[in-house]
């Protein structure tokens, strides 16, 4: 019975995050990652050489291979992986279909402006509310 309820919960959660999950699957096809791991929250974390930074959409996080090394004991222990998979992944679970218009759109606009219009500072990117919240949820201290 417990296993059945867990399966139902996972199905409901996948549907709750369906817009992000669909977009995440599309981006997986585009970026064709080379390495995959499962994060602590059950999200899938992919490392792709074609990805410039990182993005989390529902159960799927795609992170630049720049942040991955073969000799890593725990690749998901990096701040970038925690920020993406655990931080933004938890935001997606909380907000469901509101994640893309609230967090996703804000983050994309911020990423486009940061460094181009807004002056670059060390860890300044992570001071924006969506990124600061993702760091907090992911347990990242900068």
Model-based region annotation:
Residues 2-52, 100-142:
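Metalloprotease/metallohydrolase-associated module, dominated by Zn2+-dependent proteases
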Residues 1-5, 83, 87:
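Short amphipathic alpha-helical segments and their helix-coil junctions
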Residues 57, 81-82, 86, 129:
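Alpha-helical architecture
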Residues 85-103:
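Catalytic Zn2+-binding segment of zinc metalloproteases
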Residues 18-27, 73-85:
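Charged, low-complexity, helix/coiled-coil-prone segments
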Residues 51-54, 61-82:
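Short pre-active-site segment immediately N-terminal to the catalytic Zn-binding motif
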